[in-house]
């Protein structure tokens, strides 16, 4: 709170979170993603001059295993603690909507240079780069709306410029790609083959098998 008072931000982009779905500590997920966000909003609401916009990053994981192309009105059906924490964060943030200019975003899967190798795309790329013969993955029958982190950042920048309206926005490409497509693309780029093995330890119950957003 003291640091917020010193900085007096004009616009805020809140990305701090436990973002790895398979993070093993559920208590930490909720403490960081929900309580941590509430602490930030409380500090911002205490400022004499409000920021013009406070952008809060939720996640498309809140939709769960919904079918079809998903817009912001699609019902929420979170399938893991990470997704539940993001849904709870959204509900908590609504309590501050009359005091702060909020913008909620639900980004679909995105990746880029520097992302940790525990995430899917960097893990696959790293295995091909090292010339590995085998890669162990969890559920392979999945498809996602993959996005470039630079496009996500540009979307956030545009939404920040609009001012906080209390609205929720999907950040997505509107295109869905299977895990098998990603593997085949890397085979083509690298000129290498790799054996894909399913490691039961990586298989998650209630896996979200398909996510595609409506960016219209």
Regions found by a protein language model. Give the residues of each.
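Short-chain dehydrogenase/reductase
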Residues: 28-34, 74, 78-90, 115-122, ...
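Hydrophobic positions on the long internal alpha-helix
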Residues: 36, 40-44, 92-93, 155, ...
């Amino acid at each position: 709170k003291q640091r917020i008072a010193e900085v007096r931000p004009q616009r805020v982009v809140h990305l701090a979170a436990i973002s790895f779905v398979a993070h093993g500590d559920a208590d930490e997920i909720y403490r960081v993603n929900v309580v941590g966000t509430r602490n930030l909003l409380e500090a911002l609401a205490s400022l004499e001059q409000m920021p013009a916009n406070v952008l809060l990053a939720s996640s498309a994981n809140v939709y769960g295993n919904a079918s079809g192309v998903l817009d912001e009105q699609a019902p929420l059906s979170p399938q893991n603690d990470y997704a539940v924490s993001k849904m709870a964060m959204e509900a908590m943030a609504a309590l501050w909507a009359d005091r702060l200019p909020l913008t909620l975003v639900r980004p679909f899967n995105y990746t880029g240079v520097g992302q940790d190798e525990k995430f899917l795309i960097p893990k696959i790329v790293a295995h091909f780069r090292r010339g590995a013969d085998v890669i162990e993955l969890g559920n392979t029958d999945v498809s996602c709306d993959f996005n470039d982190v630079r496009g996500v950042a540009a979307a956030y920048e545009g939404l920040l410029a609009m001012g906080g309206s209390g609205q929720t926005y999907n950040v997505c490409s509107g295109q869905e790609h299977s895990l098998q497509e990603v593997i085949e693309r890397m085979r083509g780029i690298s000129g290498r083959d790799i054996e894909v093995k399913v490691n039961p330890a990586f298989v998650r119950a209630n896996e979200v098998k398909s996510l595609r957003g409506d960016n219209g």
